Amino acid sequence: MAKRLTKQQLTKAIANTLEAPATQSRRPRNRRRRRSAARQPQSTQAGVSMAPIAQGTMVRLREPSLRTAGGVTVLTHSELSTELSVTNAIVITSELVMPYTMGTWLRGVAANWSKYSLLSVRYTYLPSCPSTTSGSIHMGFQYDMADTLPVSVNQLSNLRGYVSGQVWSGSSGLCYINGTRCLDTANAITTTLDVGQLGKKWYPFKTSTDFTTAVGVNVNIATPLVPARLIIAMLDGSSSTAVSTGRLYVSYTIQLIEPTALALNN
């Protein structure tokens, strides 16, 4: 005849049967958590570039977009702006932010309208040099054409939109040029014109010669002709001979009004 358990013994027996599966079920979950944690990528500090062993970019410019509504033509495109090089001395140059100088294709198109308005302008540097190339690039905007050009990185770094980087870095900015989706641009060397800081909405189409001539008369007369200029400093190279480092591209959206014959646009 089976021994009859007391109420206390029965409760203990039931508890023992429940603990074992619970303990066993926790172990696989713990192992899964450890495996999941091992698969997580290690965090990196944003904005820090490490020299790659080998790196390259295929530049494919997006097709220009042109649309007209209500007498206003809107043009969106990306172009090569200028080639850049570096020496062991600081070299500071500037690019006038206006249709005549932003890109050769835009120059030919915008010359058929009397006035323009900048909706967005972005300059992006893409390297074309080995990762062993020494040098740095610095960029920023000036919004008053009467101001003198900076002569040092310290002065340039105070400009609106200032950005800098090593000449071999910046390839992650390619998405700004070809119009693809940008996933990680922490190391992109790119700067955007603050169109909200411009002196006026509409500017007359002028050439760089027109601007230079006006400056020769009075710099204050020349100021209303150009929205802004991009200041570029190249320095920290290892040789007194200029070494090619990369190219500067410009992406823009611009409004054009008052169409005119090219021969009449002065």
From Swiss-Prot:
Query: Where are the stretches annotated Disordered?
Result: 13-51
Looking at the UniProt record for this protein, which Gene Ontology cellular component terms does it annotate, in alphabetical order? T=3 icosahedral viral capsid
* Annotated localization: Virion
Spell out the residue ranges making up region: P domain, projecting: 258-266
Q: What is the predominant subcellular site recorded for this chain?
A: virion
In this chain, the stretch annotated as R domain, interaction with RNA covers 2-71
The record's Gene3D superfamilies line, in alphabetical order, gives: 2.60.120.20
**Could you tell me the keywords of this UniProt record?**
Capsid protein, Disulfide bond, RNA-binding, T=3 icosahedral capsid protein, Virion
Gene Ontology molecular function: any one: RNA binding
Region S domain, virion shell, residue ranges:
72-257
Q: Name one Pfam family in it.
A: Viral_coat
- Disulfide bond sites: C175-C182
Top-rank taxon: Viruses
Q: What InterPro entries does the database record attribute to this sequence?
A: Capsid_prot_S-dom_vir, Viral_coat
In what ranges is there compositional bias, type Basic residues? 26-37
Q: Explain the purpose of this protein.
A: Capsid protein self-assembles to form an icosahedral capsid with a T=3 symmetry, about 30 nm in diameter, and consisting of 180 capsid proteins. Each icosahedral unit contains three protein subunits (Potential).
Protein family according to the UniProt entry: Belongs to the icosahedral plant coat protein family.
Q: What is this protein called?
A: Capsid protein
What is the organism lineage in this UniProt record? Viruses, Riboviria, Orthornavirae, Pisuviricota, Pisoniviricetes
